[in-house]
Amino acid sequence: MARHSKWHKVRQFKGAIDAKRSASFTKLAREITVAAKEKGSDPAMNARLRVAIERARKASLPKDNIERAIQKGVGGAGEVQLEELRYEAYAPGGTALIIECVTDNRNRSTNDVKHLITDAGGSLASAGSVTYLFDRFGVVRVQPAIDGEKRDEIELSFIEAGAQDILHDDEGSDIRCAPSELAVLADAVQQMGLHAEHIEFEWIPKITVETTEDVGMQVQELLEELEALDDVSRVYSNMA
């Protein structure tokens, strides 16, 4: 009995991991499909598609899945139509949220997002009432951090490639640029032989909001619940 019980728990745990992995793969494939539909199937000419493919590869999405997702985006007829949605909201403590979705059912996404936010004591906001608190950037995260004698030379090269800001911490360097310059900046990083830990489009808060410990835990729980929704691809907040 003990052996059976232990195996049952192992299977439950593995099943939960497999389900989470499958949901992640679905989200990644949807992002690829939408990116390909928007600006074509060539990553060299479509920075957003390139970013989506890079994220998928890092998450070990199989190559066949990536190719099918691209074809789904450019194929058009007969395919389930996906659309992008962006929700703006306020969480407890006045924390601002931006929730990005890729979905085949607008009503489902709206209901799911609204339900979680209102249950947490927050509220959906009108378009533009939250995004003004953020800046939209392309971000290349380089690891390890850029340092040493050639740091100034490297940073100058990044500025020439479109970098608007370069931030360093103990583990790496974040290079920020206008979204339209992300592909060029990513190429510059690669040409210099540096390791790009991730290449992303991000909403970055202009000013962060301090919360009490209790409110902070509430907001963090809400963020995790939103990210777990099948249709949600990204969640951003201005919580410090």
Region annotations inferred by a language model:
Residues 139-240:
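Positively charged, low-complexity, intrinsically disordered RNA-binding extensions
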